[in-house]
Swiss-Prot record:
UniProt tissue specificity: Component of the acid-insoluble and acid-soluble organic matrix of calcified layers of the shell (at protein level).
Cellular component terms per the entry's GO annotation: extracellular region
Keyword annotations: Secreted, Signal
Signal peptide positions (record): 1-20
Descriptive protein name: Proline-rich protein 1
Compartments (UniProt record): Secreted
C-alpha cells in the first residue's frame, strides 16, 4: 500500500514537471502579469499574481487573477472572471533596432495617352412575351363499363326446371315386318328357339 502511494505521488510529480511552466506570474507594470515566451501580458489594475494551472482537451489555462485560454489555431484570449467587461492586455515587446533611412530614388515621369472613350450601345429591348394560348380542357371520358344494376336488369330471368313434372315418354309398339326372312336368319331363329331364346323381329 505504501509503495502504491509512493508510485502515485511520483507519477503526479512527473506529469506536473513534464507539463512545464510556460506561464510565470510577475509584477511588471506594478500589477499582476503573465510572461509567455518572453512577452509580458499584464493583468488589469488591482490584480495580484497567482498561479493556477489546469490541463484540458486542446488548450492550457493558467490564472494569474486573469485566465488565459489558448485554443489550437485561434490565438490567445483573455478573460476576467471578476470584471464585468473584458479588457485587452498590454503587450510589452522587446526593443527593436532603429531603422536606417534610405533616400528615395528620383521619380520617373511617364506620360500615358488617354484611352479612347467607347460609347456603349443602348441595351436591347427585351423580347415581347409569347402569347398565351388557352387550351380547352379535354372532354370527360365516358365509362366503358355498365353499372352492376344495369347488367343484372338486362339479364333474362332463369326458367325454373320442371323435368320432374314431365310425363314419361311413350313408345310405339314394334310391328312385324312383311319382308321374307333370309335362309340364314331362319336357321338362326330355329337354333335360338331350341335354346330357349325368343328373339325379336329380323328383316
Amino acid at each position: 500500500m505504501m509503495k502504491l502511494g509512493l508510485y502515485l505521488t511520483l507519477l503526479f510529480l512527473s506529469v506536473w514537471t513534464v507539463s512545464g511552466e510556460p506561464f510565470k506570474c510577475t509584477n511588471i507594470c506594478g500589477k499582476g502579469a503573465i510572461i509567455i515566451a518572453g512577452v509580458a501580458y499584464c493583468c488589469p489594475q488591482g490584480y495580484k499574481p497567482m498561479i493556477r494551472r489546469k490541463m484540458e482537451d486542446a488548450f492550457m489555462a493558467t490564472d494569474c487573477d486573469c485566465l488565459f485560454m489558448m485554443p489550437a489555431g485561434q490565438g490567445m484570449y483573455a478573460q476576467y472572471p471578476q470584471a464585468p467587461n473584458q479588457g485587452s492586455f498590454i503587450v510589452q515587446q522587446p526593443p527593436q533596432a532603429p531603422a536606417v533611412a534610405v533616400a528615395p530614388a528620383a521619380a520617373t515621369v511617364q506620360v500615358v495617352a488617354p484611352a479612347p472613350t467607347v460609347v456603349a450601345a443602348p441595351p436591347a429591348a427585351p423580347p415581347p412575351p409569347p402569347p398565351v394560348v388557352k387550351v380547352a380542357p379535354p372532354a370527360p371520358r365516358l365509362p366503358t363499363y355498365k353499372p352492376m344494376y344495369q347488367m343484372i336488369r338486362q339479364q333474362p330471368m332463369r326458367q325454373q326446371r320442371t323435368w320432374y313434372h314431365r310425363p314419361a315418354p311413350t313408345y310405339a309398339a314394334p310391328t312385324k315386318s312383311t319382308k321374307p326372312k333370309h335362309e340364314f336368319f331362319k336357321f338362326l331363329d330355329d337354333f335360338l328357339s331350341k335354346q330357349g331364346y325368343r328373339g325379336g323381329n329380323r328383316g
